[in-house]
Amino acid sequence: MRIKMVSLEDGTISCGFRKIAAFTARINPDTESYYITTKRYASLRNVLFGSHGIGVVDADAIDEIAQGLKDADLIGFSSMTGYADITRRVIHRVRELRPDVLMVWGGIHPIIEPENAITADVDAICTGEGEFAFEQFLSLAKEGRDYTKVENFWFKRGEDVIRNGFLPLMTTAQMESLPFPQYGEKEKIYREGKGFEPMAFADYVVHGGQDYSTLWSIGCPFRCSYCGNTKFIENDPNYTKIRHPSARYIVDEVKSVRQRFPHISHVSFHDDSFMAIPYKQLEEFAELWHEEVRVPFTVYGVIPNYVRRDKIEILTWAGMNRIRMGVQSGSEAILEFYQRPTPPEKIREATEIIAEFTPKYHVAPSYDIIMDNPVETRQDVIDTLELVYAMPRPYTLIIFSLKVIPNTGLAKEMLKRGIDLEQIDASYLQIPPRMANILLYLLGTWCPPRWLFDQLLKRVEASTTPQPLYPRIGLLFRFLFFGKKVINHLKFMDFSLMPGWISYYAYRIGLIDFWQRRVIKRMPRPEPPKRAFSPDVAPVIATDAVRH
């Protein structure tokens, strides 16, 4: 059976898609992967001016995409809610060209909004973890047998919808058995006016630079109402448990990628809750990474409640050079509204621990802040600004304008309150130039004296209060803010946030290699772990380095 797997998003990171694509290629060798990118972050102008939003794909491009997909026997689509409309249009056009082709829609959107996704011109949607459910579905489809009882799927039969339940979540052993995520194997990318072409080395550089993005763990112990994970937890409460393959598995995955792409000299872990992984597993990971990989890595998705000095220390010793932690708000009332059990005092405690390692060992940490919540009062906004002002420096901020994901707890609560929700396809990085938001850009760049900060606070209002906008001042402070962020990274020769040729040429001329082999070795590092005093640590389980 000829299968085409299709990812639609901003770029080509697609961590989850790469996993299911690799698994599908294992069970069905005649499988190819296709990437349709909106390129909304490809422009420096978009970043500086905040003019993001979902990329526009016109009718001619939709037709060209569909023409390139139509000759498959089965097409599997993957997209988030922000790209649901584009996905739906592609599916519809493929159906016009090939009424008999089997089409399945997976990814985040069908899980969060299955009732919406099933109305597309598809035969099925995947509503849970896809790997082993898809294997069952594909086996039955190839044999011409009834597949409509396969769990983790909904199926359409004429006007009827068959809504099946869920398989148990993958076990650690099952995760260990999966092939490594697909990267550089039978992948194609859409180029406007040319259709799909094999991904060239330049595509990996343009979209990723010298960084490789991956996931080690799945799951999140929190039920934050704004997050799509709440739907995963609603479907199976066990999603609050952190699951992951062995440390050997993730280290060998990265080694496998670096063997084929030697320019990869930084790794980003996009786990939802990396720091919630038990210390013993982190220690095992750290020793393997320090011994066998020896390149810097960044940990995203850090939750304040799980920040511990010993975990930060062991990961820093291994090579962690940056942390990104979710703060979201400094208002206890708003954190409770988000159902996020991270009180401001816990946030302050976490930032103080992280500050012990910055800038001695780390690039300035990034802290996520959510603004423009219509429920916030003026005092809630001030509480957030006060918390950010008091956090130990250096740090940088990642500022989001609240966008509500449909069918989440937050969406339901907002609707109860009669709040008119903005469309999800408005980017959460489009930050209105209100005084509160401008102050965040200022705080991410410079710590003003207290008297000046107090004066500026007097101009702050809740986002729903009519107030003047300052687009020119906002642009100035955005420019300074991003300039400071670039400087912070260049101090550590960290190009992980700079996809494109700049980071590649830094690798080619030997700058990154010189820095990592000569300079970092001489920089102070925490003491290595003393495994002799940790007899209860589980032994490393050896696995094959190549998983096809």
Predicted regions and their residues:
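Glycine-rich beta-alpha loop elements in corrinoid/cobalamin-binding modules
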Residues: 2, 9, 23, 32-33, ...
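Radical SAM enzyme core and accessory elements
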Residues: 2-6, 19, 25-32, 54-56, ...
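Hydrophobic/aromatic residues located in beta-strands of well-ordered beta-sheets
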Residues: 3, 33, 103, 150, ...
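Short N-terminal binding/cap micro-motifs at the start of the first secondary-structure element
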Residues: 12-19
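Flexible glycine/acidic-rich beta-alpha junction loops that bind and position SAM and/or redox cofactors
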Residues: 42, 114, 222, 333, ...
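Catalytic cores of alpha/beta
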Residues: 114-120, 312, 374-390
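Structural recognition of alpha->loop->beta junctions
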Residues: 116-135, 317-322, 387-399
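Radical SAM [4Fe-4S] cluster-binding motif and immediate context
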Residues: 176, 183-364, 371, 386
